[in-house]
C-alpha cells in the first residue's frame, strides 16, 4: 500500500491561537480524520465536530517533540470515535458494525481499486466491524489510512509492539472469520 506524505511543518505557536491558523494547521490532516471517523460509524459528522472542539481546546497541549500534528489529531479523532461507540453500545447493539454506514467517496474509490474481489469486500468490512475496538482501530489506521507502525502507536498511545500484537491478532481473527476465501 502506498504511503501518503503529509506536510509536517507546524504553524507558529501564536498562529494556533487563531481560528484561521488552527484551520490551516488541521486542513492537511482533515481527509484522514474524516476517513477514520467514517469507518463503521454513521455518526461521523458528530465525531468530527467533537474531535475539532477537543483539538481546539487542547491545542496548547500539542507538543511536536512527542509526535506529528497528524498523529495528534488522529488520536483525538480515535478517542471521539471510541466515545461515540461506547454511547451507541449503551443504547444499541454495535451499530458501527454496519458495513454500509459512513462510507466516504474516498473509501468507495479505494474499494474500486482494491485487491479484494468485490464479492468479498462486504464480508471483510463486516468481519472488521466484529473485531475488538483496539484491533479494528489498528487495522483502520494501518491498512485503510496507510499509517506506519510508529504512527499507529502514536495515535493509539501504546508501544509499537502492542500495535503489532493488535494487528497480528486482528489478522488471525479475520482469517478465522473469513475462512479460505481470503488466504
Give names to the regions the model predicted:
Residues 15, 52-69, 87-89:
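Sigma70-family region 2
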Residues 3, 9-35, 42-45, 56:
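A short, charge-rich alpha-helical start-of-domain segment used by transcription regulators
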Residues 57, 61, 75-96, 169:
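Arg/Lys-rich amphipathic alpha helix in sigma70-family domain 2
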Residues 138-142:
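A short pre-motif secondary-structure segment
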Residues 46-53, 67-79:
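Structural recognition of an alpha-helix C-terminal capping motif at a helix-to-coil junction
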Residues 84-119:
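Short, basic/polar amphipathic helix motif occurring as a linker/hinge flanking DNA-binding modules
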Residues 78, 82, 156-180:
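DNA-recognition helix of helix-turn-helix
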